[in-house]
């Protein structure tokens, strides 16, 4: 006769995130000892971890937090959207974010090497992934500080955690700075710029766009006298698509992002945008 109850099974499932049959088998093997059963579940899960190494991790979530004027954002990946919305996975991401905030880590290597309860965070992630039955990867981290930093998370599906996250920093403080930082962070989530200013765009990319614009204009039979103006116009169009401050502001297309920031008396200093799997 089993020396555990349905309540024990439920409690262990909540603690581990494992399936009902896996929990029952572990409790049977552990003779009803919950702590031993957890160890069994972990061991069995870790045995399968090597088989999961080559699997794709295209699902997951983005988590972010601003504390003490410092913004931190992470992307944590898993294999399926089923696990991405599981409480256990979300709790793991929250744990990783907390470690990222507290440790001051600014890169993945440093973050994963940070000790949590006597072991590297990387081991904690593997163990939790084993319980979930999927490969789990902490893919990237961003850390911004100085002035005012806003963190914005966007859900692309009501059934999933945030799939898009943004950190945006401006060089001022106060209510106007905070409002502008937030509004532009929301804009970044929607419009996905790749660069903060024109100076940040690699020169070879600009030259490539210029050559393409010129060749296209020639192929279209544009007059030579107007070529310079046409090419510069198309390069400007490229900037308006790729450069944050040149983009038309999402909330009011009559203004550029640069104008919105100028009206608030601030300048953007840095941004990061994560989208799960991209």
UniProtKB/Swiss-Prot annotation:
Q: Where is this region: Involved in Mg(2+) ion dislocation from EF-Tu?
A: 80-83
Q: Which InterPro entries match?
A: EF-Ts_dimer_sf, Transl_elong_EFTs/EF1B, Transl_elong_EFTs/EF1B_dimer, Transl_elong_Ts_CS, UBA-like_sf
> Record keywords: Cytoplasm included?
yes
Under the heading Pfam families, the entry gives: EF_TS
Question: Mind listing the GO molecular function terms for this protein?
Answer: translation elongation factor activity
Keywords recorded for this protein, A-Z: Cytoplasm, Elongation factor, Protein biosynthesis
Which stretches are annotated as coiled coil? Answer: none
Q: What is the annotated localization of this protein?
A: Cytoplasm
Database matches in PROSITE patterns: EF_TS_1, EF_TS_2
Q: Which GO terms describe its cellular component?
A: cytoplasm
In its keyword annotation, does this UniProt entry include Zinc? no
Give the family this protein belongs to, as stated in its UniProt record.
Answer: Belongs to the EF-Ts family.
Q: Give the function comment from the record.
A: Associates with the EF-Tu.GDP complex and induces the exchange of GDP to GTP. It remains bound to the aminoacyl-tRNA.EF-Tu.GTP complex up to the GTP hydrolysis stage on the ribosome.
Q: Name the chain's protein.
A: Elongation factor Ts
Species per Swiss-Prot/TrEMBL record: Arthrobacter sp. (strain FB24)
Lineage here is: Bacteria, Bacillati, Actinomycetota, Actinomycetes, Micrococcales
């Amino acid at each position: 006769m089993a020396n555990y109850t349905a309540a024990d099974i439920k409690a262990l499932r909540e603690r581990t995130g494992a399936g009902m049959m896996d929990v029952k088998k572990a409790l049977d093997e552990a003779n009803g000892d919950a702590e031993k059963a957890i160890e069994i579940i972990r061991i069995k899960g870790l045995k399968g971890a090597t088989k999961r190494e080559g699997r794709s991790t295209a699902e997951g979530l983005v988590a972010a937090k601003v504390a003490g004027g410092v913004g931190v954002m992470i992307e944590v990946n898993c294999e399926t959207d089923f696990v991405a919305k599981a409480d256990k996975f979300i709790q793991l991401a929250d744990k990783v974010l907390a470690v990222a905030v507290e440790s001051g880590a600014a890169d993945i290597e440093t973050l994963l090497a940070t000790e949590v309860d006597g072991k590297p965070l990387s081991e904690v992630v593997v163990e939790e992934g084993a319980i979930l039955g999927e490969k789990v990867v902490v893919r990237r981290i961003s850390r911004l500080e100085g002035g005012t930093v806003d963190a914005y998370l966007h859900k692309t599906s009501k059934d999933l955690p945030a799939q898009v996250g943004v950190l945006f920093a401006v060089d001022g403080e106060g209510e106007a700075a905070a409002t502008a930082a937030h509004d532009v962070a929301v804009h970044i989530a929607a419009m996905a710029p790749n660069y903060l200013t024109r100076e940040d765009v690699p020169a070879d990319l600009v030259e490539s766009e210029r050559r393409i614009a010129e060749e296209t204009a020639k192929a279209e039979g544009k007059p030579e006298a107007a070529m310079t103006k046409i090419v510069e116009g198309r390069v400007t169009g490229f900037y308006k698509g790729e450069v944050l401050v040149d983009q038309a502001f999402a909330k009011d297309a009559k203004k550029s992002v640069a104008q919105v920031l100028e009206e608030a008396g601030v300048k953007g200093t840095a941004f990061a945008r994560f989208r799960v799997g991209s």
